[in-house]
Amino acid sequence: MSDSNLTNPIKAFFHDEFPEQYQEPPGLQKNMKPVPDCGEKSYKGSGKLTGRKALVTGGDSGIGRAAAIAYAREGADVAINYLPEEQPDAEEVKELIEAEGRKAVLIPGDLSDESFCQDLVKQSHHELGGLDVLALVAGKQQAVENIEDLPTEQIYKTFEVNVFSLYWVVKAALPYLPEGASIITTTSVEGYNPSPMLLDYAATKNAIIGFTVGLGKQLASKGIRVNSVAPGPIWTPLQISGGQPTENIPKFGQGTPPAPLNRAGQPVELADVYVFLASENSSYVTSQVYGITGGIPTA
């Protein structure tokens, strides 16, 4: 028998039923029950990103928050983007980044606006003194059971936030990105196995896969790598603010189909992948998608 202190992954994080809950979108992480684990108390860095300059969209909560915290603890200065309504969560992230002795830049705004995306990149580059990591995590997800009830306005907005903003941010950032820079997008298991109530969201996540693979090939000659992360059911404000029907929240991650690990993932469980893809440890990795799904297939 091994003497190592291993943990059963089924029990590594919260694995009971969640309380039924709902917040008006976009929702605040600080008001969730339980509050998602983004590594605030557990993530320990080792200098993998010393001196780097990162922009993280959706950096106030959930997966983006976990990436921002990890980047700071690995030695990077970090700019985060979020919606103005998410300011309370963003202020917490700012404190966590600055506690590591790193610079934190808060830039609220709506990614569905192309001009804002351009300004976001310019401000990030100016205030950080450079830019060499784009972690594009922000997303919009609203469940609608029947296509007849899916508003055209929602379809447009979901594509603008989830897909169009990637084009706008990357186009604005390319003049600043040096050789060795890394672009990380965020797709989803929904891009491979769509839920019937997430037609617009799933379509955007499939589009992100094509965008990532193609852009990685296009930018390889410039020495810029492009990869994506495909989360499974992760406990974030996206889920409790309309991303899932309220009645599905208690068994989120345990529903149909369930993750084989039979629980929702926590944002901190993706942090190492965002660090790896930003760091030189992934120097031979581009145009790839990394699934962090609790065992749900991505093929």
Swiss-Prot record:
Its EC number is 1.-.-.-. NADP(+) binds at residues 55-79. The keyword Secreted does not apply. The active site is at Y201. SUPFAM superfamilies: NAD(P)-binding Rossmann-fold domains. It comes from the Bacteria. One of its GO terms (molecular function) is oxidoreductase activity, acting on the CH-OH group of donors, NAD or NADP as acceptor. It is an enzyme of class 1 (oxidoreductase). Residues 1-44 are annotated as: Disordered. Substrate binds at S188. The keyword Oxidoreductase applies. CDD domains: SDR_c1. Keywords: Oxidoreductase. InterPro entries: NAD(P)-bd_dom_sf, Sc_DH/Rdtase_CS, SDR_fam. Belongs to the short-chain dehydrogenases/reductases (SDR) family. This is Uncharacterized oxidoreductase YhxD. It comes from Bacillus subtilis (strain 168).
